[in-house]
């Protein structure tokens, strides 16, 4: 029985070829994103937090075809549906090289009090480093390694100009409309000028509304995460 907000559902078109479904899942109310290519219906799943049946149901009812599972970091509340989705779709599991061992640590994952179905180790298929890319057809996801919440926390950036589907006058402001206080998606560019929104970043728990994820959990480092917020950012992130 889910103790989270598995019925929270939001679907949005961000560009001519990029759509996103957000689900809030599990006891920790974790954001899970299904990013899909509007032209092909191919999709990937970011942070399969919990409630695998809810994720599978949303994929099915929207006619989507999963290609990858991306994990921003290896904390329990972001991966409890990982095994079920891997078994269902037999698709690559993608995580940073640094955080990959966490997916194998059943004891650490299962010690959290909200785990109802014991987690079983999942071996990742793709190990990422800074700047590595994952492509969903013509949509490019660039990896950003952002230590602090965990040593290998990753964010995934979509640069609109490097995807072939450019925004039109009809939907150019939907990215700005989509950003809200409950998301862990952040835009690149000026949120007050929709034409200047250059892309979006899926941040996991590295960046939250009004702050950042805990650094008191295993692998957290306050100094590392403070550097992310105090160092000049060439990425024009808002």
Residue ranges and their predicted role:
Residues 1-9, 232-238:
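Single conserved hydrophobic/aromatic residue that forms the stacking wall/gate
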Residues 10-62, 155-164, 195-203:
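Conserved beta-strand hairpin/beta-sheet module of binuclear metal-dependent hydrolase folds
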Residues 23-25, 117-118, 123-125, 145-149:
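Short Gly/Pro-enriched turn/cap motifs at secondary-structure boundaries
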Residues 24, 36, 129, 135, ...:
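Residue-level detector of conserved, well-ordered beta-strand and adjacent loop positions
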Residues 33, 126, 131-132, 154-156:
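Residue-level detector of beta-strand structural context in well-folded domains
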Residues 44-46, 68-71, 143-145:
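Short catalytic-loop micro-motif centered on adjacent basic/acidic residues
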Residues 51-135, 139:
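Active-site HxH/HxHxD metal-binding segment of metal-dependent hydrolases
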Residues 109-111, 139-238:
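Metallo-beta-lactamase
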